[in-house]
Amino acid sequence: AAAKNIKPNIRVIGVEPVGAPTHFQSRAAGKVIKLDKVDTRAGTLAPKKTEILNFELIQEYVDDLILVDDMSMQKAAEWLWFEFGVAAELSGAASIAALSDKVFETGPRNVCSIICGSGTDGIP
């Protein structure tokens, strides 16, 4: 929300695990839904149901939601560790996984990826 308020023309893309598409499916349904199950190692990205406030904020400020699999997040976390010494958990490496897998077209523009979480589930 803050980034969009500062620069309204930026494109914000959310990333979720294939095995826990809570926001992705809620957006498609146009309302908050509850998943029957989640199947991902990225635990902090795996709620069965989101809160209405989160849903509303995503509807307003996130331009697109994309899905990445656990293996892609694992590879991204390993890359961050071995190349930069950054210990990111799988959830924190999700945006790098999306960029690495070229899940969406970035084109010739600046890209900012938020990397968070200092868990060790992504480090071999």
Regions found by a protein language model. Name each.
Residues A1-E60, D101, T106-P124:
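Glycine-rich phosphate/pyrophosphate-binding loop at beta-loop-alpha junctions
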